C-alpha cells in the first residue's frame, strides 16, 4: 500500500528525518519532517495549467499550527483554530521569501504549499522544519522549482555561533538568525540581534549556509529515489522584432522619464510613454484582422524600464540623481501631537512615517497564545501602510501579511534597546503610520519609533537607525545602493535591510532574487549600510540626543514597590476588599505580582504617593517601643482596643490607660477617640500590648 522513502541526517544536536510516500499521497509532493519531537507535514500542489490572462505567479504558502499538536485546546469561546496567528503569518512569509525567486519566469500555474505542525516539541521551534519540508515537497513534486534549498537557525552564545539552538539557549543568545539558501548561495536572512558587529553577523550567516548543506544533500537523495518527473516549462519567448521596434521608438523617452527625480511626476511620465507604446503597437493587422498584443507590449515595456534603471545604476546614475552611497534628505520632528505620550514625524525623501508611543501598565500587555503556552509582551509595534501613502485607493481594514511582516522587522530592530521592566515598568505600544512611501518604510518606522520613544521619556539603551540597501548585478559588474527607492527595490536584485548603530547590528533582513551573491558583496553591503545608518543617526540627533527627563502630562505615572509575598493577601483583602478600597480612594490602578512586586499607576503624583502610603501602612510590622496614633475601635471591661495600623489592633489594658487607678475604661477613652499609644510588647501570636501611661508622662514633662 505504501512506498515509503526516508532520509535522515544529523542537524545540530538532533537528527532531522524526511519521509515521503505514507501521508498525503494525492498531493504533487508531500514530506513528513521530524526534528526532535516536532513533526511537520508539508504538501505542495500546482495546477496543471495557468489561468487565461494570468500575468503573475500565484504562489501561496500557508504555515499552520494545530493546538492538538502540543496537547492543548484553543482558548476562548471557539474551540478550534480560526484565522492565522501572527506567528503563522510570519513563518509563512519566512518560507515564501526564499522559494519564490526559484521558480522560472513564465511559470504562472497556481501553486500552493501547506505546512502543518502535527507534533510540537517545545525545545525546538518548528519553523525550520517547515522551511526544509517545503523545499523537499516542491523538489519531489516535479514542478519547475530550481531548488532544493536548506535552512537553519543560528544563535550566538559565549562568542560562538550555535546551530539550531533550543528555546532555552535562544533566551541566552545575542542572536536569533534564520538563513535559507541553495547549494551555492544564500537567498534569505532574517534576524534579531543584540549589537553584533558586521563581521560577526557575516560569519554567522556563512556558518548557517555551510551547516545546512547536508540537508540539501538529503533532499537531493530523496528526490532521486522518489521524485516525480519534472514538468517541462517552455522558456519565455521574447519577440525580438517587437522589442527592437519599441526600443527604437520609446527607449529614449523611458530614459528621459527615469531622469525625473520626483516619484509621482516620474510615474506619470512613464505612464504616458507606456500609453503611447500601447496605442502605437498594442494592436496589429494580421490577414486583414486586428489582433491585440497589449499584454506582450506591456511585458516588453517593463523590460525596457528595468534595463534603463539597471544600466544607469551600473554607470553610477540613480533615478533621483544621487550617488550610490548618498542618503536622501532627512527631516525629523518630535512632539507633533499634543495629547499623545510620544510622537515623531520622520521624513526621508519621499518616505514618511508618523510614529507614536503610548505608555500603559501591565494590564495593557499583549497576551499571546501559542503552542508552547501563553506569554505576555510588554513591547509591541503596529505598522500600517494605507493606500493613500502611495497615491492609490485600496483596501482598508485588518493588517495584511506585508504589514505584519514589516511591523515585526521593526520590532526586532528595536528589541535590543527597550529598557527592562525593572528600569522602566511600563508597557510600550508603538505605532507607525506610513503617510508617504517611496522605499524603505520599515526602516523609516525604526527611526521614527526611536525618536518617539525618546520624546515619550523612555530611557532607551541607545538610539538606532535603519537603512535599506539594494544591488544591481550584471555578470561580474555590480553596484550596491544605499537607501533605495521603491523602483530600485522592485527592479533590483537584492533587498537588504539593516538596523543598528556604531556599536553593532540589531536587525538584518535580506532577500536575494538572483544567484551568485558572494561574501564579498554582502560584506560591502554591510559596511556601506553602517556608514549610512551612522549618517541617519546624526540627522536624528539634531531633533533629540537623549530621552526627555519628564514624561507627558497625559502619560500614567507608575510607582514600583516591593512587599513580602506573605503580605500580599493583606493588601488584597478578603474578596479583594482592601485593594478595591485603595483604588476607589486614590483613583490608582494597582497590579500585584506573585513575587510581591506592586505597580501603582496614576495620572498624578499625589494620588500615587497616597496609595504607596496606604500600602506601606498595611504591610508595616508593629515594632516594640514604637509610638503610634490610633483610633479606639472597641471598649471592653478590661481595656480598649486601638487600631494602630490597617488591619492591626492592639490592647491598652485598663491598668495602662493612665497614671492613676481607673475604675471604668470609659472614664478615660471612648470609642472613636484618637489617642497616642506606645507598643509595650508583641507576643508570639502577634497580639499587641499598648500603653498610654508613658505618653501621659511624656506630655507632663
Curated annotation (Swiss-Prot):
Catalytic activities: RNA(n+1) + phosphate = RNA(n) + a ribonucleoside 5'-diphosphate
Keyword set, alphabetical order: Cytoplasm, Magnesium, Metal-binding, Nucleotidyltransferase, RNA-binding, Transferase
Sequence intervals crossing the membrane: none
SMART domains according to UniProt: KH, S1
Sections of the chain in a coiled coil: none
Keyword 4Fe-4S recorded: no
Assigned GO CC terms: cytosol
S1 motif domain segment(s): 625-693
GO molecular function, one term: RNA binding
Domain KH, residue spans: 556-615
EC number assigned by the record: 2.7.7.8
Broad EC category: transferase
Pfam name, any one: KH_1
GO BP: any one term: mRNA catabolic process
Subcellular localization, as worded in the UniProt entry: Cytoplasm
Gene3D superfamilies according to UniProt: GHMP Kinase, N-terminal domain, K Homology domain, type 1, Nucleic acid-binding proteins
Binding site for Mg(2+): 489, 495
Cofactor(s) named in the record: Mg(2+)
CDD domains noted in UniProt: KH-I_PNPase, RNase_PH_PNPase_1, RNase_PH_PNPase_2, S1_PNPase
Family: Belongs to the polyribonucleotide nucleotidyltransferase family.
Function: Involved in mRNA degradation. Catalyzes the phosphorolysis of single-stranded polyribonucleotides processively in the 3'- to 5'-direction.
Protein name: Polyribonucleotide nucleotidyltransferase
